[in-house]
């Protein structure tokens, strides 16, 4: 638990603490998969991730809405999110895309961006070095992520993602492709 608390504290020191910030949210059509999959983005209203070209604001559909939480970190998470949104749309639900990585002004968004850069670096090195794969990359990905200490840190770090959820309607279900949006 102490290791998990220290992990969270390091991120707060590095990226700040926005736990008291009230982020106003807006719903806009997703400019890429909005027409095809019926997806709308949940954005911070007037924030960096607010896509001005997406058109007018929409209201949340409280009867048929479903939020797909993701971190857009690694192609696997992104593909799974797309599949969930596609299935939800096919079944008559209204998918809302909640990409925590797009909220770059938030502490959580900054944490995700830093972790994504680190993961991308490791991934590139693993593609070039068999020794790195054997000694670092494979053990970390196959064994490290299963450790309770790692999962405790993930749980604690998920708290850094919670401020942006403050104005999300609590009566709309959320599915997520990563522990951070799921636990936040």
Show which residues each predicted segment covers.
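Conserved N-terminal ligand/cofactor-binding loop architecture of enzyme catalytic domains
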Residues: 1-48, 86-169
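Extended non-catalytic scaffold regions that mediate assembly and binding
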Residues: 52-54
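Short hydrophobic beta-strand segments
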Residues: 66-70, 174-175
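A short, glycine/small-residue-rich beta-strand->loop->alpha-helix junction that serves as a flexible
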Residues: 71-82
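A short, charged/proline- and glycine-enriched loop
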Residues: 56-66
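Residue-level preference for short coil/turn positions at secondary-structure junctions
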Residues: 62, 169-170
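An aromatic- and histidine-rich active-site surface loop
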Residues: 77, 155, 174-183
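Surface-exposed, flexible loop/turn segments at secondary-structure boundaries
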Residues: 74, 103, 182
């Amino acid at each position: 638990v102490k290791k998990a608390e220290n992990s969270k504290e390091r991120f707060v020191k590095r990226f700040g603490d926005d736990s008291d910030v009230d982020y106003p949210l807006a719903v806009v059509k997703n400019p890429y998969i909005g027409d095809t999959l019926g997806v709308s983005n949940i954005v911070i209203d007037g924030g960096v991730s607010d896509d001005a070209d997406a058109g007018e604001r929409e209201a949340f559909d409280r009867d048929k809405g479903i939020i797909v939480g993701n971190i857009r970190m690694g192609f696997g998470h992104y593909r799974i999110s797309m599949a969930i949104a596609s299935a939800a749309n096919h079944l008559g639900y209204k998918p809302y895309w909640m990409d925590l990585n797009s909220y770059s002004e938030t502490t959580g968004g900054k944490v995700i961006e830093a972790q994504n850069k680190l993961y991308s670096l490791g991934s590139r090195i693993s593609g070039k070095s068999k020794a790195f794969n054997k000694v670092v990359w494979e053990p970390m990905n196959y064994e490290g992520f299963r450790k309770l200490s790692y999962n405790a840190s993930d749980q604690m770090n998920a708290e850094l993602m919670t401020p942006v959820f403050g104005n999300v309607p609590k009566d709309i279900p959320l599915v997520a492709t990563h522990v951070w949006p799921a636990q936040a």
